Structures are given as C-alpha cells and as structure tokens.
Amino acid sequence: MMNTGKQKPGKRYPLVNWADGMPVNKKHFIQLEDHFTDRLCEYQSFQLNRANYGLLPFRKGEAVSGDFSITELVTGTLEVRLKRCLALTAGGYLIDYDAGGDDELTASFHIAIDETEDKDQRWDVILMADPFERLPSGIPDEKETSPRQPDALPNYALSVVPTGQIDGNNLGRHFLVIGRLRKNGNRCEVDGNFIPPCTSMSSHPDLKNYYLKFGQLVDSIEKASSDILAKVENAEKQTPLAVNIGMLCRHVMLFISDIYFSYRNEGQYYPPLRFLNVFSTLAHRLYVCLGFMNKEEKEDLLKYFNEWNGINPGAYEGLLRENSGLLYNHQNIRPLMITAERFLYQFNDLWTTLSQIGRASCRERV
C-alpha cells in the first residue's frame, strides 16, 4: 500500500479538489486560474534576483518601456499619468500595461507647504499589478442573453511616495518603481537622471547609449594600447618605465580580447550588474598591475601619467579603487554608470595621449 504524504497547508492559492458530482461554479475556475498564475510567477521568480528584474526591452516602434507624465491641476494637485509599462516584477509577474485610447492610469498627490522649502525633494512612482484581482474588459457579445464583458484584466494601481520612505528592494512581489519625480524651482518634473530597475541594457534609452558609448571607448583603448606597445617594443632602450607601460598595455589588450566577442554580441542584453562588472574588472586589473611594480617604479609611472594628462597620482589610484569596489544598487543605477564612465573617459584620454607621443619624445622617457 502506497503511503501518501501530506503537505503542509497554507499555500496562497491551492489547487481545487475536483470530485465527480460536485457542484461547480465560477469560484472553482477562478481558484484554479489563480493557482497556476501563482505557480508561474513563483517559477519565474526563481530565475530572478535583486539585480535582474524591472523594465523589459521596449518593443519595436516604442521609445521607452515605462512612459508616464506629470501635470499640475488648477487646484494645485499634481497628477501622474501612466501611458504604458512593460516590465517584470521581482516576484516574477509580467506587467504589460498600455492605456491605448482608454483613460490613462493616474495617481494624484499634493506637496505640503513645508515640503516646498526642500530643494532636493524627490518622489518615487510605484506601479502595482495584482493578477488576482480581475477587472472586466471588452465589448459584450450581443448574442449572449446575459450581457457581460468577455475579458478580464489585472488590476493596476499607481502611487507616489517620497524617495527613501520605502526600500524599493523590499516592495513586494507585485510592485515596481518605474520612475522618479523631482522639484525644479516651484514645480515638479520627471527626473530624467533616474534610471529605474531594468532587466537589461536594452530596457532604457540611456542604458542603450551607455552600451554604445562604452563600446566605442573600449575600441579606442584597445587601439591606443596596440600603438603604445608597438612604440615600447621598437624603442632602442628598455627602461623600467617602458617595461611597466608595456605590461599594462598587454594586460589591457588581453582583457579586451576575453570580453570582446560577448560584449559585441550580447552586451546590449546584459543586466546592468553584469555590464558594470566588465569595467569594474578592468579597473581592478589595472590596480593590481600597479601592485606588481616596486614603489619607485610605480611613482615614476604615475608621475609620467601626470605629465601628459594632469591626473595626479593619488587621484589616478583613487579612480581605480573606486571602480574596483563598486557596490551595485538596482534602485540607483545612474551613479554607477557615471562612475564607470568617468573611469573610461579618463583612461582613454590618457592612453590616447600616450599613443600620440612622437617617437623622439617616447625614447626620451620610455
């Protein structure tokens, strides 16, 4: 005889215990649908973590995945209007909202008088999607004797809360921060600097621009490394400075060769965390390379860099340390991109300058 074990009760949406001859009504089908919806969300959530949920890549013909605006009513109340949103919540639920020709989803809020004095006031725009609360939709079929709207849509709700009041990483499985508002003088506007949680570098226009921009900088750094190394190898005299610069160039070129194919073909689909890992690792490798040199050689190298692009030795090492030790925050992506961008621009500027130094000048020092 088979011993059938009992599971612990308490599932949010249990299966229906079907039996022959049982009375059936719509509640049973709703329970069944809720069970599989919940299971699908939970299965999807197993593939998610704190760094790969959020806005999805926008569809062809659309400029953004989360489109909302803000207007001020004559009463002084501020109203946020959501036009569309395509995203994946941390709980694995797909948000696919498009107002189309219907009324847009709205949320109203009012700024208290004492808050208007805070010049740095910001508010998070949060979208809630509840697939278990259905809203009737569609045009009734005239052939049905009992008129009803044939379709059902998930319930969506929009809210606006002061930034920092709620931790975006712990909102719950059906909530998502989709944008931010900020004060600009005496009025509020959409904060264009804020990048909400995104599943990939193709989920936000600014992230796509970072992907393209960083790719161009990588190409430039690789070419400059090759040119510098050629000068070092062809120099009549191999000084310690020349050897160390050549060593840095080799490490840079080997690193780029390791990531180039993947970055070129998959980089635009990387989650922001994986994307930043590429450049944080490059900075860390350069920082480690400095540690290969003795104290005098490192000081000589950093002084040489300072002569050609004005970065003082302490600032250069600090730049490498800052990018090596990035702490990723899915709710605050922009500052991390700016940090990586600053490193790449300064390193590219230095390397490009060194690659353009004339041979005579190169032989004098290198």
Which residues fall in each region the model found?
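Extended, amphipathic alpha-helical scaffolds
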Residues: E266-V366
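Basic, amphipathic N-terminal segments
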Residues: S69, I95-D96
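N-terminal "first-domain core" detector
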Residues: K6-K83
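Elongated alpha-helical scaffolds
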Residues: L105-D141
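Short linear interaction motifs
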Residues: P9-R12, Y97-E115
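Short polybasic amphipathic segments
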Residues: K83-L88, I178-L181
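Short, solvent-exposed secondary-structure capping/transition elements
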Residues: D38-S45, D96-A99, F132-K143
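Mixed-charge (acidic/basic) macromolecular-recognition segments
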Residues: N3, K143-L282
